[in-house]
UniProtKB/Swiss-Prot annotation:
Its EC number is 2.7.1.6. ATP binds at residues 123-129. Pathway: Carbohydrate metabolism; galactose metabolism. It is an enzyme of class 2 (transferase). This is Galactokinase. NCBIfam families: gal_kin, PRK05101.1. Catalyzes the transfer of the gamma-phosphate of ATP to D-galactose to form alpha-D-galactose-1-phosphate (Gal-1-P). Mg(2+) binds at residues 129, 161. One of its GO terms (molecular function) is ATP binding. It comes from Actinobacillus pleuropneumoniae serotype 7 (strain AP76). Belongs to the GHMP kinase family. GalK subfamily.
Length: 384
């Protein structure tokens, strides 16, 4: 059963009446451009056909009752009072979004009953949290008929995750969930928020392979990477590493390395990764899948060696995928790191070969069974 059907059904069972409306917000997979978003850089994700559905109805007071179907928990809070953190981690994503919507739209106090469910695997690097934030943001916008654009909802979602949940994420996940386009990957300039859609190449599939090693970005590694990038930006005297050219980096690399080895390595990844994203857009436009595969491999190597966010299980999955796919296509880790998934652009005729090579080898080597998803690029958040 699809999340949107399950949300509608469980809403009726839980509240004893039918939901008025349902919102669906997709997860995302990032083809290339990792950790560049919070450095004001470039990313190239697409929204995927896995996501979060929220069924909801207005109440005649200012209370939100939120039923999390997948874990059978409920949260309740009053929009006429200051919104405080909950002991339930999932509930803070909901409360945080509503809190920052109220900062922008102080008149918003419309109560509601909500039931929500997701088929995005948790802690997989496919943005289950952004799908939750954007679905809640859109729900609030509809409930209050609020004058919020999709980009504004995305930035409110990011604000909630940064300030209320405590993960210093960039804005890519939320922007993709809000603004994704069917059959397109979208290059996002994370400073200007300009979007360049590029069609998914004909004859290719997007495969996502979950290592089933879970990650949790609220822990310190992600935030320390961000601090190291900020150190490097201060060293170069710029607002963000987006503003450092490759030439300027090379000129002062030895000096930065002497001051702070980790900041040097992190900056090397970000500056080279931004360049790879720009080249990837051109490769896709030219249908040059050999070049795109090389860029994806370069991105993975940089995440492994300079940003140091991969783990042995992920590196092994990428190696297997690269062998299976060959030169026409590519594979790399996707998401924040320390587990999660790899993404592959794979010729349609090689999908089963890829699936088989990984099934035959990954569990044997690691003791963990992978999960294989074929995805399509889909539209961003919408009312169903």
């Amino acid at each position: 059963m699809k999340p949107q059907q399950l949300a509608t059904q469980k809403f009726s069972e839980h509240y004893g009446y039918s939901a008025a409306q349902t919102v669906f917000a997709p997860g995302r997979v990032n083809i290339i451009g990792e950790h560049t978003d919070y450095n004001d850089g470039f990313v190239m994700p697409c929204a995927i056909n896995y996501g979060m559905a929220v069924s909801f109805s207005k109440r005649d007071d200012s209370v939100w009752r939120v039923y999390a179907i997948d874990i059978d928990e409920q949260d309740e809070f009053d929009l006429s009072r200051p919104i405080e953190p909950s002991e339930h981690k999932w509930a803070n994503y909901v409360r945080g979004v509503v809190k920052y919507i109220q900062e922008k739209c102080p008149e918003f106090k419309q109560g509601a009953d909500l039931a929500m469910t997701s088929d995005v695997p948790m802690s997989s690097g496919l943005s289950s949290s952004a799908a939750l934030e954007i679905s809640i943001g859109k729900t609030a916008q509809v409930l209050g008929d609020l004058p919020l654009s999709l980009a504004e909802i995305a930035l409110i979602g990011q604000q909630a995750e940064n300030k209320f949940v405590g993960a210093n994420c960039g804005n890519m996940d939320q922007l993709t969930s809000a603004l994704g386009q069917k059959d397109q990957v979208i290059m996002i300039d994370c400073r200007s928020l300009d979007i360049t859609p590029t069609p998914v190449p004909h004859g290719y599939s997007i495969a996502i392979i979950n290592s089933n090693v879970k990650h949790d970005l609220v822990t310190g590694e992600y935030n320390s990477r961000r601090q190291e990038c900020e150190f490097a930006a201060r060293f170069f005297g710029v607002k963000a590493l987006r503003d450092v050219t490759s030439e300027r980096f090379i000129e002062r690399a030895a000096e930065l390395q002497a001051q702070n080895e980790l900041a040097y390595k992190r900056a090397k990844h970000i500056i080279s990764e931004n360049q790879r994203v720009l080249e990837a857009v051109e490769a896709l436009k030219a249908n040059d899948m050999v070049k795109l595969g090389q860029l994806m491999a370069g991105s993975h190597d940089s995440m492994r060696d300079d940003f140091e966010i991969t783990i042995p299980e992920i590196d092994y999955l990428v190696e297997l995928a690269q062998v299976a796919i060959g030169k026409n296509g590519g594979a790399r880790m996707t998401g924040g790191g320390f587990g999660g998934c790899i993404v592959c652009l794979v010729p349609d005729e090689k999908v089963e070969h890829l699936r088989r090579i990984i099934a035959d080898n990954y569990e044997k080597q690691t003791g963990i069974k992978e999960t294989f998803h074929l995805c399509t690029a889909c539209d961003g958040v919408h009312l169903i």
